[in-house]
Every structure is written in C-alpha cells, then in structure tokens.
C-alpha cells in the first residue's frame, strides 16, 4: 500500500508542479500557444515513467517476480491514487485561484457553460484519463517486466 501511495503522489506532484509552472511562468497551455500540446504529452510521459518505476519496485519487493495480473493491479492502484491526489490538488488550486483557472479550458460553446459544468468535465477527464492511461501503461509495462515464478 505504501508503494501505491508513494508513486501516485509522485505522479500527482509532477502534474501539480507542471500546472503551477505553466499557470504562473510558462503560459504554454493557452489556446493560441503552439506548445499547448506539451501539457498532455508531459502528463502521459510522467505517468508512464513513474508507473514503470513503481512496477519495477514491486517486482524487486517480490524477490524478482512480477506476474502480469499483479503488475496490472498495482499499476491501476497507483493510477487511482494519482487521480485522487491530482483531484485534491486541482480542488485546492481552484479554491485558491478561482475561475481564472478555467480560462484555458475549452467549453465547447464559447463561454456559455457554467464553471461548475466545466469543472465536472475537467475532473472526470482527469480521473478517467488517469485510470484508462494507467490501465494501458500497466499492461505494456507488466508485459515488459513480467517474470514468472519458478516452482
């Protein structure tokens, strides 16, 4: 359980630092920026790398054995803790910054949607995106790191 919380918190910290740096220093996530694609690339790369490190540690904890099922389950648990920690960060960030945080969010119909609808969509996207990405990355990493137990 410590491993799951540790690596989930590491991913969330990476994402939080990126968001703070982008919001206050870099400003690359603005819609007119050509570099706005860096944010989703960074989010996915951070999740993949930290999941790899977490699953590698899980394998070493189990005396060098990692089955595909254990790897996927651990990866999903790490991704769930990441989604929860990142959600808590964004709630705190929204409470501190307010609706200025939503300036870069696409709302689909101009700015006609209420902030609450945009927030629910953003949190759902973060939560389910983290879980879906975690599932895909865990499958790939588990196949790469798998070591069958010897009888």
How should these model regions be labeled?
Residues 1-58:
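Transmembrane alpha-helical insertion/packing segments
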Residues 2, 6-10, 39-43, 69-78, ...:
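Alpha-helical transmembrane segments of integral membrane proteins
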Residues 46-51, 130-140:
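Hydrophobic cores of alpha-helical transmembrane segments in multi-pass inner/ER membrane proteins
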Residues 52-71:
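Membrane-helix interface/capping segments
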Residues 66-74, 78, 140-151:
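Cytoplasmic juxtamembrane regions at transmembrane-helix boundaries
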Residues 75-93:
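Hydrophobic alpha-helical membrane-insertion segments
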Residues 88-111:
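Functional transmembrane-helix hotspots
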Residues 113-136:
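Hydrophobic alpha-helical transmembrane segments
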